[in-house]
Amino acid sequence: MQSIILIGKPNVGKSSLFNRMARQRIAITSDISGTTRDTNKTQIHIHSKKAMLIDSGGLDESDELFKNVKKNTLKVAKESDIILYLVDGKLAPDDEDRQFFYSLKKLGKPIALVVNKVDNKKDEERAWEFANFGVKEIFNLSVTHNVGLDELYEWLEKFLHEEFLIPDEEENLEDFLEHYEEGKEFQFKEVDQNHIRVGIVGRVNVGKSSLLNALVKQERSVVSSIAGTTIDPVNESVVHKDKVIEFVDTAGIRKRGKIQGLERFALNRTEKILSHSQIALLVLDAHEGFNELDERIAGLVAKHYLGVIIVLNKWDKSEMDFDKTVKELHLDRFKFLAYAPVISVSALSGKRVHVLLDKILQIFENFTQKIQTSKLNTLIENATRSHPLPHDYGKLVKIYYAVQYDLAPPKIALIMNRPKALHFSYKRYLQNQIRKEFNFEGVPLVIASRKKGSKENDES
């Protein structure tokens, strides 16, 4: 697997970018210079490709400990495939940064200069001063505000080759292709259509227990204004339109620095609950507003490939505009959950809570949907006719056929002549066409490309 290393002096935002790209809080971040001294690493996916992301310690000659960190960082950089060098956009370029950057450039690897903390027009003007580093690829970011990352991801994706699949999915897909006969309908795994498992997640005190109580119409969990009252997961079931909906009320997730004892255990339980859920209700506090921790929790939901409904609780106390809020969530904070419906409720008064029950049934139906192979291929043919596949260095790229090979979540295989040539933007176009035609609201849609008649995912 290819690796991407984040390098830069202390406090330029490496750990924040690492957390943003990993969609979870792994590295400790603060405004104190040099908070991260050890090398952190985690597997990530950028669009349809996977990579190992490495967060190095800060480069600084002023401290004996940091001299050792710098030595180790340069060693790891030599072993990495792609280098992202971060600088602070609120400060003028200095000779030390240039020296570090030029030493990395000599390694002959793909390298980009990432100017972080570009939060306003004044910062944008100052960022141009970094052009004298003599590098073609410069990206202005505001990691805190999630601005500028799309361009960086698109550049990174060009250098990544290994396709991302859900853990254990590679073996499942290859086994499917080995036994599948083209043109025939596939027998899917059995999914109990009458029992739906729903996990309720969110940070502390957003009203998850109140929501559960409103859904089941009884006081099952202890409800209190004290943060973190609910520690143990609590299961309750309701019957709605002849379907059993089992709810799990999870302990609230705090910022990691505040997690102690039972709450640390509860955080681990939350992960386990998500792994056994089919649909997640991601509860947000519409009165207090949203923060970075909400995004981390949303990342946990995305990581488990669940159906999802975003619940704006305490809406009766909110002064937000609903349409603007939905746009902010889908286009900014939760781009990776842009398919999730957003529903406003007031758990305490019970207002609009009933809407959730119908929506859960609808999302579950989408989550377990089976697409007829002939209809899927008709759609793919029409889509490629309307917008032909781009050539790969002058060579024709062709999709022979498409087939759904799994459900819950739905997974589709594209059998091609040159699967690695399928750009993420074209795959996203196909995803949008499939979503529009077959209604996959609220569920992730996995698309994998494979070479015809081979387990290889590219031409030999």
UniProtKB/Swiss-Prot annotation:
Check the record and name the CDD domains matching this protein: EngA1, EngA2
Q: What are the protein's UniProt keywords?
A: GTP-binding, Nucleotide-binding, Repeat, Ribosome biogenesis
> In which residues is GTP 1 bound?
8-15, 55-59, 116-119
User: PROSITE patterns, from UniProt?
Assistant: G_ENGA
Q: In this protein, which residues make up the domain named EngA-type G?
A: 2-164, 196-368
An individual GO BP term: ribosome biogenesis
What SUPFAM superfamilies is this protein classified in?
Answer: P-loop containing nucleoside triphosphate hydrolases (SSF52540)
The reply to whether Cytoplasm figures as a keyword in the UniProt entry is: no
Start and end of every KH-like domain?
369-453
Q: Where does GTP 2 bind?
A: 202-209, 249-253, 313-316
NCBIfam families, A to Z: GTPase_EngA (TIGR03594), small_GTP (TIGR00231)
Function per UniProt? GTPase that plays an essential role in the late steps of ribosome biogenesis.
Similarity section: Belongs to the TRAFAC class TrmE-Era-EngA-EngB-Septin-like GTPase superfamily. EngA (Der) GTPase family.
Name the chain's protein: GTPase Der
Tell me what organism the protein belongs to: Campylobacter jejuni subsp. jejuni serotype O:6 (strain 81116 / NCTC 11828)
